[in-house]
Amino acid sequence: MGSIGSMNKPSEGMLMGLVQYPVPIVNSRRDIEASVDRICAATAATKAGYPGMDLIVWPEYSTQGLNTKKWVTEEFLMDVEEPLFQRYAQTCKENDVWGVFSIMERNPNKNQMPYNTAVIFNNKGELALKYRKLNPWVPIEPWMPGDLGQPVCDGPGGSKLSLCICHDGMFPEQAREAAYKGCNVYIRISGYSTQVNEQWILTNRSNAWHNLMYTAAVNLAGYDGVFYYFGEGQVCNFDGTTLVQGHRNPWEIVTAEVFPKMADQARTDWGLENNIFNVGTRGYVAHPGGVKDCPYTWVKDFAAGKYHLPWEDKIKIKDGSIYGYPTTGGRFGL
């Protein structure tokens, strides 16, 4: 962190802003349009207030809300290419800023459930990255697991960006996948309620430390009549320490300077605790070059399609019936 309150753009890094968007109460298509209006206006205002801002991040569900009675209906779903969502791209272009945005996306396969998707538009309004949530928050979320893997793209200030959505961040395997593909700034957008606030903070830090990369995470904020959403935008250094963390205030904008080249340097220069390298080169002092074989049963089983826990047959909740979802799969909720 190189400036008071992270108000200035660093010459060899990037200035980012995490917006603790008030959880939108969405009951109609017009409400979605109004949310897009607010996000576009706030993106422009934030860039005007922070002229050096490189990247602005909006939480999961900020576009379409969390109306579980309607969230999988055609009225509520969107496509990245449609004019309403493309307003975000135009806003990024007009304001010379990168942006991360949330969309509940129609599935091209009409026989399957929609995707929970996040995109990065660059400062020219171009689609830099599209990511579909790999690990929906079962059993409450009905989204189809993502089919795009864990993409990484070049970002501002020497960054290599990758996205995860909410529950994804609870999986260290996924953060490692992003880092293994070169990510040095791992962005997490979420719509969690307060029940997992501490675990969210913990995993943001651990994902950073395990992979020697920055993590930046932001959650919805406020009350929607059912749950309270905790906000608390957080940016973690590549050593797992928290650089900055917000409070529970809706509309709080958490800003941070990050220096991706420092994470890159740690990855190339460290010996002790360079664990993303050491895991694949075990014991290189005793065995030159390190032992390369995989010692982990679960990794081998997962790769072979045989992942099975010792207690798996005793697990009580394995479908969405507790939340009223059918157990037959396919497309439902139209």
Swiss-Prot record:
GO MF term set: formamidase activity; N-carbamoylputrescine amidase activity
Catalytic activity: formamide + H2O = formate + NH4(+)
EC number: 3.5.1.49
Enzyme active site: 60, 133, 166
Keywords carried by this UniProt record: Hydrolase
Top-tier EC class: hydrolase
Domain CN hydrolase: 14-260
PROSITE patterns attached to this UniProt entry: CN_HYDROLASE
Any one of the GO BP annotations: putrescine biosynthetic process from arginine
This protein's record includes keyword NADP: no
Listed SUPFAM superfamilies: Carbon-nitrogen hydrolase
InterPro entries cross-referenced by the UniProt entry: Aliph_Amidase/BUP (IPR050345), C-N_Hydrolase (IPR003010), C-N_Hydrolase_sf (IPR036526), Formamidase (IPR022843)
NCBIfam families in the record: PRK13287.1
PANTHER family: FORMAMIDASE, NITRILASE C965.09-RELATED
Family under the similarity heading: Belongs to the carbon-nitrogen hydrolase superfamily. Aliphatic amidase family.
Role noted for this protein: Is an aliphatic amidase with a restricted substrate specificity, as it only hydrolyzes formamide.
Protein name: Formamidase
The organism of origin for this protein: Nitratidesulfovibrio vulgaris (strain ATCC 29579 / DSM 644 / CCUG 34227 / NCIMB 8303 / VKM B-1760 / Hildenborough) (Desulfovibrio vulgaris)
Gene: amiF
